[in-house]
Amino acid sequence: MQVRIFLSWCHRNADLKKALLADLLPVLGIFTDLEVEWWEDSHLTCGEEFLPGILDRLDEADFGLLLLSTHYFASEFIRQHELPRFAGPAADRGSLPVALAPLPEFRAEHDLGGVERQLVFTSGSRSFAELSGHRRTTFANDLAGSIRRRALAENGYRSL
């Protein structure tokens, strides 16, 4: 099965994003039952219009991998153009929310665009940024497995 994933992230988290993808992308690439096509804004080409280029890729995506942080939720661009496609009442694409950095407690006084109603991927309630060494690799491996199960709709009942 083929799946298209749009990477939604805040540029202030570039180092964390790079570290996560260094371990995540190779694992996604070795699945035999899932072919992942990946897109992020760095794939825009010279002369391409920024906003239409991003909106077109959003339209083509099956899922959005949301790399969550306080900077992510504070980004006006993300809140206006990307997040509504993956969370909240107007969402029309699958969401794969990941705690890239520590997040505020999901409380009524925080506007998290609907993500607060979704299961956010963590490692034992810890974000990727809170881990180091082999624990980061394990985080990426487990995230790849979670992405695979969601893409293949293997999130239902299981035999005992």
What do the PLM-derived regions correspond to, one by one?
Residues M1-A22, P26, F50, E60, ...:
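C-terminal interaction surface of TIR/SEFIR-family domains
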Residues L7-C10, D33-V36, G64-T70:
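A generic short-segment signal for beta-strand/edge and adjacent turn/coil regions
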Residues L25-D33, G88-D92, E154-R158:
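Alpha-helix termini
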Residues E40-D41, L67-L68, L112-V115:
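Short His-Asn-centered micro-motif
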Residues L55-R107:
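Conserved beta-strand-loop-alpha-helix hinge of the TIR/SEFIR fold
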